[in-house]
From Swiss-Prot:
Source organism of the structure: Pongo abelii (Sumatran orangutan)
Job description of the protein: Is a positive regulator of nascent focal adhesion assembly, involved in the modulation of endothelial cell attachment to the extracellular matrix.
Location of the protein in the cell: Endosome membrane; Cell junction, Focal adhesion
Gene Ontology BP, a term: focal adhesion assembly
UniProt topological domain (Cytoplasmic) ranges: 436-853
Extracellular side: 25-414
Protein name, UniProt field: Thrombospondin type-1 domain-containing protein 1
Length: 853
């Protein structure tokens, strides 16, 4: 009975269920939950019941977002389908939240309304799970790190409008627990946009928040405020920690470098400690060998090799941050360090010098410190030696030789020393030999005859007529002395020197002798000696009662060549009475006396005789010295036959000319003053010169005067007066005699008359006016001299022009052309021309005409 009752109960239940289910309407979800952004699809089952009258209805299912009540999508059911399953794709669920599925029927015929009914279902959507990770970037030293985003949920492949996510990173300098008692923490936010991916790394830069940094990562959907996931804050020091970078094994030479790699966005600040890892008993503390502190921002430190033992040992290094941190980060790294000692120790003190005196050697040593004594490898020398110099040894005590001193440099030094000394001696000997050869190897150039009757002037200088200087050189192309006088035909022997024809002059043989003579004579004769001599003679004439005299000087560019020349030649006197000798003592003699006649049986005087005659003293103190060339070449030149005529023995050089210099014209000067102190010297010199003239006058030889030349001479000497007839001493074969005083005065009248037109034209000079008052009678005898025309250097070099007689044979010579030119007449006083003192009262003005006292 019981089993039959049980079966009936089951049948009844089935019938009841069929009735209920057949008439019910519903909307059911297969899965109550869903994951947003995932690739899962949402399935919804539905069923609805048709009415009894069989009216058709339209049924739709809506997907609504519960928070905003917005419709996401709508799906319609078929009219003939009362039950089934609807599929909603994954791309409808982009965001986590609550969703509603609602089924709503719609009537097709509005005439028959029916009551509204509605079925719904609830769906909860969640975010997928993303794992956030932090990592060091490859550019950790530049302050960057990486954020990793990973999920295990398969993501929906959005065909269109794929959503993007935003990663926010927040940097802080403290933990939330520490913010209660401190100020507002520093917070720096940075964001990056990225695509939706199942796994990816996003790189971020560090923010300067301080030595400690904390990071919070937030993942959001772009355009939405909902947060997909959030991680943090994460301490970067705890996350990454500090790392000690070193090699596992090294050989220590100078030091061991340890580098600390800090966490990203964190500055290093701590202490690096080194200790030796060795087995120790339990409870024994590790001994630290050294500690190096790292300042803020520094990453490297070096430990010296002297801290480590020799050989190979294991040492460990650890790094600890400052105690202010909320956590204690310890990083430990160990490594094997091999230390091989191969270095020099300290130098030992210097040893004593090897010698007690002189040069010695001292040395010092050092030891190589190495781990392998069998094969030391220290570079360099273990022994060093140096020279030591002590007190010098005595001459008999030789210095001890140095055993370690190299011999090569010493020998080379000795060779250099000997060579230098030899070279110096050679130079000294050569200098001495050259000096001796130049002093004694050359012949004497000048032979100066001494004069015993020379009287010095009060100024302690020798006068120009006190000494004859012989210059051994040939005559220059100018007026010459003695044997180098102007040449002419043999028939010109009887003509006075002032009337002879000029001729060619032999070339100069030795110019150096003339220059040497002039330079030596400058040291003996004062430049203006001739002018002072004229003043002395003038004073002597005043004392002796002489009233008038005239002197003509040839003034050249050099004071050595100033020469006084009488204005007109006078015949020599036969003899001198004592009165005449006393009068002639202060009378200026002509430097051009006529040449004595030579007898027919005798030859003309040779050059040697003429030179000997020239070597005598000068007649006038104002005359120049004798050239050395006359004595040097007198033996090599021929006699008068080689020249065109014989030269006067008393002919003296009157001027020296040079082409490059401008000639100074000759001026006629008066002898203004004569100091009383020089009068005795002058008289003594006059007597000495007369004695020398007589001594050197040739006795056995004379000059021949031919008859025709004697006639010319008589015509040239004048037309009337005492000088017209030839004196008896001028006959052939008779020696010449001195002209007396009367003949000389009478022969000079013509010279006085020729000077009068010039005086009348220019007027008397001041000296003439003052002197003319003292004249006792106009007919008193006067010593007058004829003026000699001045010559330019070029004329004297080319022609040696001189006056010639008025004989028809000499008619082509114009005697008037040898007078003074206008330029010479316009010349002012000679002392001003030579730069003398015009304010001297004893100096008279020099003029070009005869002056009368």
């Amino acid at each position: 009975m019981k089993p039959m009752l049980k079966d009936f109960s089951n049948l009844l239940l089935v019938v009841l269920c069929d009735y209920v289910l057949g008439e019910a309407e519903y909307l059911l979800l297969r899965e109550p939950g869903h994951v947003a952004l995932s690739n899962d699809t949402v399935y919804v089952d539905f069923q609805y019941f048709d009415g009894a009258n069989g009216t058709l209805r339209n049924v739709s299912v809506l997907l609504l977002e519960a928070n905003t009540n917005q419709t996401v999508t709508t799906k319609y059911l078929l009219t003939n389908q009362s039950q089934g399953t609807l599929k909603f794709e994954c791309f409808y669920f982009k965001e986590a939240g609550d969703y509603w599925f609602t089924m709503t029927p719609e009537a097709t015929d509005n005439s028959t309304p029916f009551p509204w009914w509605e079925k719904s279902a609830f769906l909860k959507v969640e975010w997928p799970v993303f794992h956030v990770d932090l990592n060091r970037s490859a550019k950790a030293a530049e302050g960057t790190f990486q954020v990793g985003l990973f999920t295990s949920q398969p993501l929906c492949p959005f065909p269109v409008d794929k959503p993007n996510i935003v990663v926010d990173v927040i940097f802080t300098n403290s933990l939330p627990e520490a913010r209660r008692n401190s100020r507002q923490p520093l917070e720096i936010r940075t964001s990056k946009r990225t695509e939706l991916a199942q796994g990816q790394w996003v790189e971020f830069g560090c923010a300067p928040v301080g030595p400690e940094a904390y990071v919070t990562v937030v993942l959001k959907l772009l355009g939405r405020d909902s947060v997909i996931t959030s991680t943090g804050p994460i301490g970067l020091a705890q996350k990454f920690g500090y790392k000690l970078v070193m090699v596992p094994e090294l050989t220590c030479e100078s030091g061991v470098e340890v580098m600390v790699l800090p966490p990203p966005c964190t500055f290093v600040q701590g202490v690096v400690t080194v200790f030796k890892e060795a087995p120790r008993s339990p409870g024994k503390r590790t001994i630290h060998l050294a500690e190096n502190s790292l300042p803020l921002g520094e990453r490297r430190t070096i430990f010296n090799c002297t801290l480590f033992d020799m050989g190979k040992n294991k040492y460990c290094f650890d790094f600890g941050i400052s105690s202010r941190s909320h956590f204690s980060a310890k990083e430990k790294e160990c490594m094997l360090i091999q230390r091989n000692i191969e270095t020099w120790g300290l130098w030992q003190p210097w040893s004593q010098c090897s010698a007690t005196c002189g040069d010695g050697v001292r040395e010092r040593r050092r030891v190589c410190l190495t781990s392998f004594p069998s094969r030391p490898g220290c570079p360099g020398m273990s022994l060093e030696a140096s020279l030591c110099s002590l007190e010098e040894c005595a001459a008999f005590q030789p210095s001890s030789p140095s055993p370690l001193q190299p011999q090569g440099p010493v020998k080379s030094n000795n060779i250099v020393t000997v060579t230098g000394i030899s070279l110096c001696l050679f130079i000294i000997i050569a200098t001495v030999l050259i000096t001796l050869w130049r002093r004694f190897g050359r012949p004497a150039k000048c032979s100066t005859p001494a004069r015993h009757n020379s009287i010095h002037s009060p100024s302690f200088r020798k006068n120009s007529d006190e000494e004859n200087i012989c210059e051994l050189s040939e005559q220059r192309g100018s007026f010459s002395d003695g044997g180098d006088g102007p040449t002419g035909s043999p028939g010109d022997t009887g003509i006075p020197l002032t009337y002879r024809r000029s001729g060619p002059v032999p070339p100069e043989d030795d110019a150096s002798g003339s220059e040497s003579f002039q330079s030596n004579a400058q040291k003996i004769i004062p430049p203006l000696f001739s002018y002072r001599l004229a003043q002395q003679q003038l004073k002597e004439m005043k004392k002796k009662g002489l009233t008038e005299t005239t002197k003509v000087y040839h003034v050249s560019q050099s004071p050595l060549t100033d020469t006084a020349i009488d204005a007109a030649p006078s015949a020599p006197l036969d003899l001198e009475s004592p009165e005449e000798a006393a009068a002639n003592k202060f009378r200026i003699k002509s430097p051009f006396p006529e040449q004595p006649a030579v007898s027919a049986g005798e030859r003309p005087p040779s050059r040697l005789d003429l030179s000997v005659t020239q070597a005598s003293c000068a007649i006038s103190p104002s005359q120049t010295l004798i050239r050395k060339s006359q004595a040097r070449h007198v033996g090599s030149r021929g006699g008068p036959s080689e020249r065109s005529h014989a030269r006067n023995a008393h002919f003296r050089r009157t001027a020296s000319f040079h082409e490059a210099r401008q000639a100074r014209p000759f001026r006629e000067r008066s002898m203004s003053t004569l100091t009383p102190r020089q009068a005795p010297a002058y008289s003594t010199r006059t007597r000495t010169c007369e004695q020398a003239e007589d001594r050197f006058r040739p006795q056995s030889r004379g000059a021949h005067l031919f008859p025709e030349k004697l006639e010319h001479f008589q015509e040239a000497s004048g037309t009337g007066g005492p000088l017209n007839p030839l004196p008896k001493s001028y006959t052939l074969g008779q020696p010449l005699r001195k002209p007396d005083l009367g003949d000389r005065q009478a022969g000079l009248v013509a010279g006085i008359e020729r000077t009068e037109p010039h005086r009348a034209r220019r007027g008397p000079s001041p000296s003439h006016k003052s002197v003319s008052r003292k004249q006792s009678s106009p007919t008193s005898p006067k010593d007058s001299y004829q003026r000699v025309s001045p010559l330019s250097p070029s004329q004297c070099r080319k022609d040696k022009c001189q006056s010639f007689p008025t004989h028809p044979e000499f008619a082509f010579y114009d005697n008037t052309s040898f007078g003074l030119t206008e330029a010479e007449q316009r010349m002012l006083d000679l002392p001003g021309y030579f730069g003398s003192n015009e304010e001297d009262e004893t100096t008279s003005t020099l003029s070009v005409e005869k002056l009368v006292i």
